[in-house]
Regions:
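Short acidic/histidine-rich active-site segments
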Residues: 85-99
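Histidine/acidic-residue-rich catalytic or RNA/ligand-binding cores of hydrolases
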Residues: 36-43, 63-77, 96-110, 130-131
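C-terminal domain-boundary segment and adjacent tail
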Residues: 94-96, 113-127
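Extended substrate/RNA-proximal surfaces in nucleic-acid metabolism proteins
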Residues: 1-55, 59, 110-113, 118-119, ...
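Conserved short-loop catalytic and cofactor-binding motifs
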Residues: 3, 30, 64-65, 93
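Positions that flank functional sites
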Residues: 34, 60-61, 95, 124
Length: 137
């Protein structure tokens, strides 16, 4: 075992610490259920630090058996909408035909009535300007 989760508070603080790192731009699949997290706290820090939270398509694939992934990602979308915080979609492609496959995400987008302008995948210029500046090494 390479990682052992902690409490919801410990897990959330660990992710927040990563988000405050100037070299971290995106937190990948926080909603997949691997760790219990406080999504509202993460969304607030996402807005503050310009660290994007990824909505991960593959974590919701039936073959993954991650039953909390869809409700967690729906909650993330609802919070992003509430706080007007951009997100990024990830296909997490495990095969070439799965690249840019958002088929598990789109029903959640519709259910949340999530605004397209908060999806940075569709706006490369906005994506690049949204990223926080990376310090020189």
């Amino acid at each position: 075992l390479c990682w052992q989760g902690g409490t919801k508070e410990e897990n959330t603080q660990g992710v927040i610490n990563a988000m405050r790192n100037p070299f971290v731009q995106i937190i990948s699949h926080p909603g997949d259920g691997t760790a219990e997290l406080d999504f509202e706290a993460l969304m607030k820090v996402s807005k503050e630090t310009h660290t994007l939270l990824e909505i991960n398509n593959h974590s919701m694939a039936p073959i993954r058996h991650k039953t909390v992934a869809a409700p967690n990602n729906l909650e993330l979308l609802e919070l992003a909408k509430k706080y007007e915080t951009p997100v990024i979609f990830g296909s997490d492609a495990h095969f070439s035909t799965m690249i840019a496959d958002y088929s598990n995400i789109m029903p959640l987008v519709e259910k949340a009535e999530f605004p397209e302008e908060l999806i940075l995948n569709y706006q490369p210029e906005k994506f690049m300007t949204y990223l926080k500046p990376t310090p020189e090494k």
